Amino acid sequence: MQTLYPEIKPYARHELAVEAPHVLYVDESGSPEGLPVLFVHGGPGGGCDALSRRFFDPNLYRIITFDQRGCGRSTPHASLENNTTAHLIADMEHIRDFLGIDKWVLFGGSWGSTLSLAYAQAFPERVHALILRGIFLCRPEDFHWFYQEGASRLFPDYWQDFIAPIPPEERGDLMQAFYKRLTGTDQIAQMHAAKAWSCWEGRTATLRPNTQVVDRFSDTHRALAMARIECHYFVNQAFLEPNQLLRDVHKIAHLPGIIVHGRYDVICPLDNAWALHEAWPNSELQIIREAGHSASEHGICDALVRAAAEIAQRLLDLPPEEA
């Protein structure tokens, strides 16, 4: 069982001004001469942390992490202005150009897999390979499953807490009801809705209860950004065309991909990964038997660390023992 690499500090930090009012936080760690990899975080609105750097051998990889618009250390916090998928794709290209990188590996989980796929399909010539976890295709049925009916039947106790801020007469369209509160002027109602939204995700993210994950999702600062930005994206169908990611998978058919997905992922059910793998013959699908959605689960963590080592071995032409 592979574990995370030891915690490391960035060797460079950047504040990158993009379209107003946004300033992105970007950092670099590992080897400045290593294989560039971009860690694409989830949410949207989740942000990066010290854990984000630890899936990669710092002697082999130049590790780039960034907080997407409105979250983490990027500013302004929880802003929805000029915040769409197209903006985030443009930001990734801006970061690549700013750092002088020709091509890089994309490493993304959950919404990070969505954004990685969308970017790779827009700029396939800039991508070496993709390592994806917890695939989220952002189809209408995917939103309905987690935010209207589906996961609710597996976790009725957690679901009751999730819908508590919404009066019964508005529960026919929960995403719209949450959006009204998350974008409203009543700050108490906004925070109540944000905590309920974020905690629902945190409590269902792992196969076995994990208080550390729940506590991270319950953090007030994080919850506000994630709930507002996620809801903003999801009521707009992630600013993607219908079935866009599967429709355009031919654009990355030549790229290698490793897909890691938990068998019991309730947030992004396994059929997301299965459909992507079926459409992308150059991908490898690893189904983790005893895991849900979170990258912190042992089986998923092991598979991701191994995947990063395998991609480095292939691209750097290393003997197996060095990767």
Where are these predicted regions, by residue range?
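Conserved HGGG/HGGXW glycine-rich cap/lid loop of the alpha/beta-hydrolase fold
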Residues: 18-76
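A catalytic-pocket lid/entrance helix-loop region that shapes and gates access to the active site
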Residues: 125-178
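Conserved alpha/beta-hydrolase "acid-adjacent" motif
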Residues: 241, 266-272
